[in-house]
Amino acid sequence: MLGKRKGKQRREYVPDYVLYDLETTGISSLYDEVIEISAVKVRNGKIVDEFSELVNPGRPIPYAASSVNNISDKMVENARSFEKVLPEFLAFAGDDVLAGHNIAGFDMKFLYRDCEKYFGQTLTNDYIDTLAIAKLCFPEWKHRKLSDLAEHYGI
């Protein structure tokens, strides 16, 4: 949802949330653009809905980004802009808690920026960053990538 105050980072379990991920043209929320947004809506541990859309960033996708996310200019040439896609994602998420890995340090910055840019308000949803939780649960680990967690839990 949109409003004047950003949502808070939470660390407690919530049964209902929207797990999401962004792919972008680079790592800077100042200069780079979203090229894909994907999400699942979870209710009591079960996926009940999905959202996924490629986004045309309005400029070429750098090779470095394409080599990481495997999204090419050809794939997004007929896609809509993030200005058109973002309202649909916001409607999908509603006022649910947002969740994802490293979203506090990355994904949320893009959402905050673009909500301000397109709507003049910020994203008010609370969020859970699984990277922050992994740091609390596994302080001795050198790395806490999503793949490390998946391997640890046999996923």
Residue ranges and their predicted role:
Residues 2-125, 139-155:
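Conserved non-catalytic scaffold segment of RNase H-like nuclease domains
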